[in-house]
Amino acid sequence: MSLNIRPFLAGNWKMNGTRESLGELRAIATGVSSNSGHLFEALICVPATLLSRAYDTLNGESLLLGGQNCHFDDYGPYTGDISAFMLKEAGASHVIIGHSERRTVYQENDAIVCAKVQAAWHAGLVALVCIGETLEERDNNKVMDVLAQQLEGSLPDDTTAENTIIAYEPVWAIGTGNTATSEDIAKVHYFIRDKICSRFGDEGNKIRLLYGGSVKPSSAFELLSIPHVNGALIGGASLKAIDFLTICDVCRKL
């Protein structure tokens, strides 16, 4: 953690959740509000089909809501896609962009990610930009090269701490139960911090850097204690209020 940066916990429900799941969301919101939520910020990115209903359910609670992806255009003939403006209208304040599953399954490259970031800003959303290496890239000692390329290509020149959050998610750790070592995470987050400070000046010191990759209640304290880790991008552990709020409690106590 960094003392001068307010921690941020982001939950990504992925393609999970129905109307019945809104009870868990409400429990998370209540827990965040009563769990010294002013000490940190919490976000849940629900499926687009739940976003509007989730917004109405929370009715002004301190829990933030986000989308999991957006198109790079504001509108148009893109069957099945959702624009950033649509997410904003439905109640989102943030949107995940460039998640490893989008980069690998849908072959979204840095240029597409960058265009989506700009679309998110245009709609008034904060972009949560994901970067990370594959197992093959890790085994070939290309981690820093890959991250440098993704940072350069995915972030527009007018990136600020107000419009962007960065999440480092080693692809090989997502949903596998594996996590990088604390030493490796510290090195990577220091590298990211150095890169964004070199490019964006002092603004780079203010941008929140999250770690994502099998973040669980049992690993939260160790991960959130690492220097330059300003929060977490949480997958499966965000689906249940008891798990997500346990991580929130760890964050509160640090």
From Swiss-Prot:
Cytoplasm listed as a keyword: yes
The reaction(s) this protein catalyses: D-glyceraldehyde 3-phosphate = dihydroxyacetone phosphate
UniProt pathway annotation: Carbohydrate biosynthesis; gluconeogenesis; Carbohydrate degradation; glycolysis; D-glyceraldehyde 3-phosphate from glycerone phosphate: step 1/1
Enzyme active site: H99 (electrophile), E169 (proton acceptor)
Binding-site list for substrate: N12, W13, K14, G175, S214, G235, G236
Molecular functions per Gene Ontology: triose-phosphate isomerase activity
Alphabetized InterPro entries for the sequence: Aldolase_TIM, TIM_sf, TrioseP_Isoase_bac/euk, Triosephosphate_isomerase, Triosephosphate_isomerase_AS
GO biological process, one term: glycolytic process
UniProt main location, coarse: cytoplasm
UniProt cross-references to CDD domains, sorted A to Z: TIM
A Gene Ontology term for the protein's cellular component: cytosol
Highest taxon of source: Bacteria
EC annotation from Swiss-Prot or TrEMBL: 5.3.1.1
Compartments, as annotated in UniProt: Cytoplasm
One Pfam family it belongs to: TIM
Keywords, comma-separated and alphabetical: Cytoplasm, Gluconeogenesis, Glycolysis, Isomerase
Top EC group: isomerase
Subunit architecture: Homodimer.
Function: Involved in the gluconeogenesis. Catalyzes stereospecifically the conversion of dihydroxyacetone phosphate (DHAP) to D-glyceraldehyde-3-phosphate (G3P).
Family: Belongs to the triosephosphate isomerase family.
Protein name: Triosephosphate isomerase
